[in-house]
Amino acid sequence: MSSPTSSLDTPVPGNGSPQPSTSATSPTIKEEGQETDPPPGSEGSSSAYIVVILEPEDEPERKRKKGPAPKMLGHELCRVCGDKASGFHYNVLSCEGCKGFFRRSVVHGGAGRYACRGSGTCQMDAFMRRKCQLCRLRKCKEAGMREQCVLSEEQIRKKRIQKQQQQQPPPPSEPAASSSGRPAASPGTSEASSQGSGEGEGIQLTAAQELMIQQLVAAQLQCNKRSFSDQPKVTPWPLGADPQSRDARQQRFAHFTELAIISVQEIVDFAKQVPGFLQLGREDQIALLKASTIEIMLLETARRYNHETECITFLKDFTYSKDDFHRAGLQVEFINPIFEFSRAMRRLGLDDAEYALLIAINIFSADRPNVQEPSRVEALQQPYVEALLSYTRIKRPQDQLRFPRMLMKLVSLRTLSSVHSEQVFALRLQDKKLPPLLSEIWDVHE
């Protein structure tokens, strides 16, 4: 099997084996927190490391890309005054009143004319927002409203003219056709929105569903690319040395735990980009991630399964057989179900959109332990279930069992998750310590 060309000597926290260094691109939790130990005051917390990687990335403003706003549920509140929110305005969930106030303040330079009769720290609500404009503007900025998002009168005029021109009917022309004679599908939806025959005739993805799928697929691609950059930092798989030596066994175990850390980081990065996830409270974010991470890792493992070689490939170049899993310290009772699940998933033949939707559905599982707002989690899950149902009916209209088969795989993952818990317990009996991040995500208490 292939291995990275560089060896690193930074110890994995808790087991004394090598692990990737903790530079800005490292998959470990130093990426954003700079400390491997929990921050002061968080000792004893079961989620100190997870909280760190859930924090927003501190990246330059110019690198942030505008994406579609998460779907509104109808009961969101304005981040400025607490009134009912109407949508995302100038980068913040806010009401129409605060949206208009912020725009007027920026366009007409109101900030220089506002004054506070108090100490400049007025508490803002639907009543006080009319009483103190200076503190209202301050609260707008604290909530995250960006002046650069506000268009000037001239920009608005040009945008209005451009929109009117786009709405004018184009000259008649023949629609572009695909090789099958149907109009070509829009990019990113695997032609699902344009396919249809038999039972699937007439079903179409809504514009919101197409946008959702495109966003999820793009987010997965972005997270995968970020993981590839961490490949050279992984402890090399020992080659040539005595495979039964203590050093070789430790190195193989460190290699696998570092791959797991990269995978966890990738899953957290993806979850933060799934519309609706960051609307949840921090406790529910942590609860959902703790319960779903191993199941998503198994889905991604199945995605990388090669039925011809009966091997699984991670990070493009790391390929593992059943024997490799066993040499890394995993039990046959866990290895065999992984490969059986991977073969079953391959028979379903999921594409990128189906995998992304299935992972999003898995994340928003309201019955997870310690979830504080299960009804809200369930409401966030529903649009992804509906999108997957429509997508599968369009893509495979003759296969009416495809959608329920996919959902049944989530049930299989629950069983595999239980087997994984037994595997983690077995590692403890072998005195193999997991890095802190994995210990927290899998609730391992030393």
UniProtKB/Swiss-Prot annotation:
Subcellular location: Nucleus
NR LBD domain residues: 208-446
SUPFAM superfamilies: Glucocorticoid receptor-like (DNA-binding domain), Nuclear receptor ligand-binding domain
Entry annotated with the keyword Zinc: yes
Cross-link Glycyl lysine isopeptide (Lys-Gly) (interchain with G-Cter in SUMO2), sequence positions: K395, K433
Transactivation AF-2: region residues: 205-446
Major localization class: nucleus
Cellular component, GO annotation: cytoplasm; nucleus; RNA polymerase II transcription regulator complex
Gene Ontology BP terms: cholesterol homeostasis; hormone-mediated signaling pathway; lipid homeostasis; lipid metabolic process; mRNA transcription by RNA polymerase II; negative regulation of cholesterol storage; negative regulation of cold-induced thermogenesis; negative regulation of gene expression
Expression sites (tissue/organ): Ubiquitous.
One Pfam entry name: Hormone_recep
Post-translational modification, as annotated: Sumoylated by SUMO2 at Lys-395 and Lys-433 during the hepatic acute phase response, leading to promote interaction with GPS2 and prevent N-Cor corepressor complex dissociation.
Stretches for region Disordered: 1-69, 159-201
Region (Transactivation AF-1): 1-76
Disulphide linkage map: none
The keyword DNA-binding appears for this protein: yes
DNA-binding region: 75-152
Zinc finger (NR C4-type): 78-98, 116-140
Compositional bias of kind Low complexity: 17-28, 175-196
GO molecular function, one term: chromatin DNA binding
Keyword annotations: Activator, DNA-binding, Isopeptide bond, Metal-binding, Nucleus, Receptor, Transcription, Transcription regulation, Ubl conjugation, Zinc, Zinc-finger
UniProt similarity note: Belongs to the nuclear hormone receptor family. NR1 subfamily.
Assembly with partners or alone: Forms a heterodimer with RXR. Interacts with CCAR2 (via N-terminus) in a ligand-independent manner. Interacts (when sumoylated) with GPS2; interaction with GPS2 onto hepatic acute phase protein promoters prevents N-Cor corepressor complex dissociation. Interacts with ABCA12 and ABCA1; this interaction is required for ABCA1 localization to the cell surface and is necessary for its normal activity and stability.
Reported function: Nuclear receptor that exhibits a ligand-dependent transcriptional activation activity. Binds preferentially to double-stranded oligonucleotide direct repeats having the consensus half-site sequence 5'-AGGTCA-3' and 4-nt spacing (DR-4). Regulates cholesterol uptake through MYLIP-dependent ubiquitination of LDLR, VLDLR and LRP8; DLDLR and LRP8. Interplays functionally with RORA for the regulation of genes involved in liver metabolism. Induces LPCAT3-dependent phospholipid remodeling in endoplasmic reticulum (ER) membranes of hepatocytes, driving SREBF1 processing and lipogenesis.
Protein name as catalogued: Oxysterols receptor LXR-beta
Taxonomic lineage of the native organism: Eukaryota, Metazoa, Chordata, Craniata, Vertebrata
